[in-house]
Amino acid sequence: MSKAISAREIAGITGMKITDEQIDIVEAGLTPAVVIAGAGSGKTETMATRVLWLVANGYAKPEEILGLTFTRKAAGELKQRIKRRLQQLRSEGKIEGTFSLEVPVMTYHSYAGNILSEYGLRLGIDTDSELIGEATVWQQAAQILRNWHDDEFRYEQTFKTLIEDLLGFTKNSMEHGIDGAAIISASQKILDRIASLPSEKDVDTVKTVLKQRIKLIEISETLRQERVRRGQLSFDDQMFFAAKLAQEVTEVGQLERAKYKVVLLDEYQDTSQSQIRMLTALFGEGHPVMAVGDPYQAIYGWRGAAIGTIKNFPNDFPG
């Protein structure tokens, strides 16, 4: 390995202005860490320089550093910025070897897709599954509801509202990893307990709600199973199954940790519950994960991102 090179020296070669605070982040040890970085704080530059420092000091090759962010545009820009500056360091003799300077920077969803493509067969998921959009998901839900014949299923809303409720329930249950069978079992136990109670308005309302919940779960499960049968996945399916795979097949985490020595997570405040389940199952056992985020800039709350995500980082990724 070449002589150690500091973050300040790297900044000088690449023409980047760097603060003492940024230097501390760039040169942090290989342990889990969360960085609170507000707008205009230079977090992207800091992440890029972190990669340069790791590579130049021999901690990891570019291909062994995984970077995740939310948009393809941000991923592409960060990837090119890092490659360009790695080339600068190599031309200055600060990086030895002839290995590729390409760093795997991608979106969270792209990474989930990679997990399914590589390991999906372990869950019976077609590795060549077609990724479908919201319009197709809506059409499939409408078709299943039209063909659903059950005298006990009475929904007093419009058909459009029924579809929206079904898709909303399906999305939320996958986002939070809810076991539909467990909910059905619990609901049925409550129904069995109150079955002998006298018929009163409140009791009848509870019975109706529980029966409707059971039917909604059954339809939701049918909808998801139908997509899998067709070799199709929605974006929510993709993340749900990637998280499920990571949690249930320990070998997947072992292989991913061997592949990526260091993980960088951008815009961590916007990660959803299913994304966190996937990431903690893969890299949550003391692996060098650095998350960068600003709790005051969360914009994806509607996707399942939670305010406490950054606060919970030490519990999700213990050192």
Residues of each region from the PLM?
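P-loop NTPase Walker
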Residues: 1-123, 226, 254, 308
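A cross-family signal for key residues in well-ordered alpha-helices
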Residues: 26-27, 243, 280, 311
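Hydrophobic positions in the central parallel beta-sheet of the AAA+
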Residues: 35, 256, 263-264, 290-291
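Generic alpha-helical segment signature
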Residues: 44, 134, 159, 209-216, ...
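Conserved helicase/translocase P-loop NTPase motor core
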Residues: 109-112, 212-262, 272-278
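Catalytic glutamate of the conserved HExxH
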Residues: 267
